[in-house]
Amino acid sequence: MPQPSVSGMDPPFGDAFRSHTFSEQTLMSTDLLANSSDPDFMYELDREMNYQQNPRDNFLSLEDCKDIENLETFTDVLDNEDALTSNWEQWDTYCEDLTKYTKLTSCDIWGTKEVDYLGLDDFSSPYQDEEVISKTPTLAQLNSEDSQSVSDSLYYPDSLFSVKQNPLPPSSFPSKKITNRAAAPVCSSKTLQAEVPSSDCVQKASKPTSSTQIMVKTNMYHNEKVNFHVECKDYVKKAKVKINPVQQGRPLLSQVHIDAAKENTCYCGAVAKRQERRGVEPHQGRGTPALPFKETQELLLSPLTQDSPGLVATAESGSLSASTSVSDSSQKKEEHNYSLFVSDNMREQPTKYSPEDDEDDEDEFDDEDHDEGFGSEHELSENEEEEEEEEDYEDDRDDDISDTFSEPGYENDSVEDLKEMTSISSRKRGKRRYFWEYSEQLTPSQQERILRPSEWNRDTLPSNMYQKNGLHHGKYAVKKSRRTDVEDLTPNPKKLLQIGNELRKLNKVISDLTPVSELPLTARPRSRKEKNKLASRACRLKKKAQYEANKVKLWGLNTEYDNLLFVINSIKQDIVNRVQNPREEREPSMGQKLEILIKDTLGLPVAGQTSEFVNQVLGKTAEGNPTGGLVGLRIPASKV
């Protein structure tokens, strides 16, 4: 049958009929159809199709053939084939009618219903025969992969592909293995096997490829390129698709391969077109698909390499990303653990508090709270607004105990004992809080549970985060701040004294303001705004004061640490000398020597009494000593 004239057609159809490249268009899944709003969605790839009348025309593509005489062997054999044109005439008639009255880009006669895609509308489909319509697969059949076995695949009837048993003698192709260019498989979550015609000349492929097509290209007759096309059966042929089980004679893949590829999704169209554009090259020997992961390669390629001589290579090996092995969650864990005081199972359990501690907290909240100046100077709140501003710091505890919580090496038997120590120390101090004591509202004891050494395991071992000279100071990482001297740990007692003076002035200003309740309604919002500004400035100053006070504490603790080490080393040396020279006079006993060393070397205690130490430094600074009595401290002239 002659091809339809393309002279009067629109350019899209003219190009399609002039082109001999068959575009692999697969049977779209109903999910794609349902999600597509464009009525021409299924037929966009039709622009590149060549509507061929006879399936035998698909065997040879004459584009790359330079010598037509080389094809006489094939044409002589193919002339003996019966021409099956009944179905194809109907298809060509449909295409002619469609192109004669409509354009592909604006097919108004095709609606957006699913029945229109199946060719079942009542006015435009060429298939109105009840017998043909009865053979049309339903949507349930098209989506029946979930109920089918993995080896089930879409199998097309023999009427669409008819080849005589021995059209080509085996002697015509000595030592040449020719496999069909299988169509791109139907989109499915199951593994589909490529159908191979049961002809003697076309041998089954034993070479897996890393794409959705099985392509073996050979050089024949003096390296002349001949592209063999077995009929592509993956276009949308309305009302002619049947779902049949695979023939028993076809070998199946091993169970390991099937299970591994059970959830794979096949590529459609695009990968096949990409494969076609590659150069036609001869492949010799066995090819191994390049899989993305080593585990997947071992799992899927081992059965193929062992049993592949008699198997049909499947076409899903290039789309295995969905079934790659998921790495174990334990492998993702870091070797070093930063949660030294928190275990994984403890995070799920809420921290338990004893009711006695809650009662103590309530009692402390009921007590009147106030700031302390230098030692004995008390600044009592004189109005309600200042008390509201002080409510943010009701949960404050002695800094000595809170420092104990934050020390990484601190160990105790229970959180209750630590809370008891906190409450006792708070009672001893009479709930007095110094101006430089600022709480972050949540102490580490309320956030996390301290682990005993017996509870340590490989996941809670200390890491380099807790080294003394590491990048991090203490348990928590250094937070980003706007202060440029955030890493400078040199104390500046004079700056701390100035902050204290500013805080006293601010408290005086806030206390002198008229209470909001005594102001008229129109003036209350402005008064509240001004007081909030003053309170915010006081809050910022308290943070700075706490930072400066912590630097003073750190300096004092380091000095005391060095002095204690000196005392210990000195007394150890005395003990060694006493043991080595027992005949020497023992006028001062070892206990007396130790007391003398402590008295001469150690000054006032710092550890456990950091608040008193800071107040002593502030007192000396107020008297005119810029260093505040800190040993070894040198204040730059710019900061004096």
Swiss-Prot record:
Residues 522-585 form the bZIP domain. Residues 372-381 have a biased composition (Basic and acidic residues). Residues 308-414 are annotated as: Disordered. Residues 356-371, 382-402 have a biased composition (Acidic residues). GO terms for molecular function: DNA-binding transcription activator activity, RNA polymerase II-specific; RNA polymerase II transcription regulatory region sequence-specific DNA binding. Highly expressed in intestin, testis, heart and kidney, weakly in brain adipose, colon, liver, lung and skeletal. GO terms for cellular component: cytoplasm; nuclear body. It comes from the Eukaryota. The keyword Methyltransferase does not apply. Residues 534-541 are annotated as: Leucine-zipper. Probably degraded by the proteasome. Belongs to the bZIP family. CREBRF subfamily. Interacts (via leucine-zipper domain) with CREB3 (via leucine-zipper domain); the interaction promotes CREB3 degradation. Acts as a negative regulator of the endoplasmic reticulum stress response or unfolded protein response (UPR). Represses the transcriptional activity of CREB3 during the UPR. Recruits CREB3 into nuclear foci. This is CREB3 regulatory factor. The gene is Crebrf.
